[in-house]
Amino acid sequence: MKFLKNLSASLVFAAGLSLGATNANAGCSAHLGDFDWDSANVHTAIASYVIEKGFGCDVQVSKGSTTPIMAAFFDGQIEVITELWEDNLVELLKPHFADGSILHRGVNTPASEQAFWVDRATAEAHGLKSVEDMKKPGIWELFKDPEDPSKGRMTSCISGWTCYTINYVKLKEYGLDEMYTNFDPGSGGALDAAIAGGFAKGKPVFSYYWTPTSLMGKPEIDMVRLEEPAYDAQCWQDMSVVVEDIKANGTEVYAPSCACEYKDMALTKTVRADWAAANPEVDAFIAAYSIPTETVNNLLAYYVDVSGGDMEATAMWYLENNTEWLDWVPSDVAANIRATL
């Protein structure tokens, strides 16, 4: 399996280092796009292992943030995405689904949520139940940003993730931008560390976050989801237009629109149509691939806390300890996989 660890914005793909011997089928290949968060890593790991070890295909994985990975997917350099936060990318995806160049391949995880969160102790002590409550006098000072002490800090997404720009627009629409910074922690690991560090030190935490994740499953992490205006499809559509404009042209093009809560959603998969036509058996596997949310949480705990971020070890642990994957592949492919475990 070939991994390009740090995908640059220029997306110049070079031959990666093979991480193990493979009996690659010259007529079967897949280039998977992976992202810089744990759940995407886990799904990419399992799919890659099955495609390489089970189907005998040549497999390459490129990892990066949302913007460069999706750009590479749209122009055909990447062929398979195993975890797509589709509702975050409405305007970006629309023309490619419409022209048939990319295809829906169903759900990979049935349930997820994204939101603004506050640690329970602070929320209960100060009656913080909604984003409107974050504007109460003196509240921002509980979360003072050390880099800008005139404001509180809302720890946000990574700037390369679409949700960073969504959160930027939300803070402005909710009138929170005058009180809080939309802080970019720099990496998914740093985002986790900021939240975990706040709990470890007994300090207030105000952050964007999502589930399923290993962090939210830890007993010491107790967060309250802040209420926002209810999800509305038209509102989200209007906001998405502004978000994509900002991503393309910078924050100076911001225009007032609308904001609402993230939609609790199933995470999905997508493939290039030309790749699907050339690799129908592997495409059928991608379409069948789906893991229950509870199992994903267990996988994430193993990936982060046991394997130390080892993608191949996590894939093997999943395949050794679960059986739903047997329904995704023909019996001969399953036998090939079992022979490697």
Q: Which functions belong to the PLM regions below?
A:
Residues 27-39, 57-62, 151-155, 286:
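Short, well-ordered beta-strand elements
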Residues 65-120:
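N-terminal segment of the mature folded domain
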Residues 70-72, 78-82, 155-240:
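Ligand-binding pocket segment of bilobal, Venus flytrap-like solute-binding proteins
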Residues 114-124, 266-278, 301-302:
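A bilobed periplasmic-binding-protein/Venus flytrap-type ligand-binding module shared by bacterial periplasmic
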Residues 262, 275-276, 283-341:
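C-terminal functional modules
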Residues 101-156:
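A conserved helix-loop-strand patch within extracytoplasmic ligand-binding domains
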Residues 219-290:
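C-terminal lobe and pocket-closing loops
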Residues 39-57, 169-171:
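Short, polar/charged alpha-helical segment
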